[in-house]
Amino acid sequence: MNPRTILAFDFGTRSIGCAIGQELTGSARPLQSFKANDGVPDWQQIEKVLREWQPDLVVVGLPLNMDGSEQPLTQQARKFANRLHGRFGVQIALQDERLSTVEARAHLFAGGGYRALEKGRVDAASAALILESWFENQYR
C-alpha cells in the first residue's frame, strides 16, 4: 500500500484553513488560509493548492455542537465538501472538528503569545489538528 497524501480544510464563512499530511507518518502541518465570502472561497486558489499537492484524499472538518448535533455551519461545510468533489473530482472525507480551533489557539498562544493568534494561522493550525484527528480515527 502506498502512503497517501491528504489535504484538510477547516471550513469557515470568512476564512478556510488548509493543511497537508502524510498517511505514512500520521502527521499534518498547516499550509495557509483562504479568505471566503460567506463560505465561498476563491476557487482558483483552492484549485492551485490541489494541483500543487495532488492529494489522494481531502478531509473537511465538520463543525458540530458539543453534544454532536448539527448547527447551521455544518450544512455549509457539507456543501463546501460537495463542491470540492464536484469541481475537482477529489475523494472527500468528513471529520468532526469540535474544539479544533480552541486547541489551535492554545497551541499557537503557547508558542508565541497574542501575536501568534493571527486568524489565518489559527485556521491553518485548526486544519492540521482536524487532519491529525482523522489519522487517529483511521488507526485505532
Swiss-Prot record:
One Pfam family cited in the UniProt record for this chain: RuvX
Location (main, coarse): cytoplasm
BP GO terms, sorted: rRNA 5'-end processing
Disulfide bonds: none
Enzyme class: hydrolase
Location(s), subcellular: Cytoplasm
PANTHER family registered for this protein in UniProt: POLYNUCLEOTIDYL TRANSFERASE, RIBONUCLEASE H-LIKE SUPERFAMILY PROTEIN
Known EC number: 3.1.-.-
Gene Ontology CC: cytosol
InterPro entries: RNaseH-like_sf, YqgF, YqgF/RNaseH-like_dom, YqgF/RNaseH-like_dom_sf
Keyword match Repeat: no
Role: Could be a nuclease involved in processing of the 5'-end of pre-16S rRNA.
Keywords in alphabetical order: Cytoplasm, Hydrolase, Nuclease, Ribosome biogenesis
Protein known as: Putative pre-16S rRNA nuclease
Matches recorded under HAMAP family: Nuclease_YqgF
One Gene Ontology MF term: nuclease activity
Family: Belongs to the YqgF nuclease family.
Domain of life: Bacteria
SUPFAM superfamilies attached to this UniProt entry: Ribonuclease H-like (SSF53098)
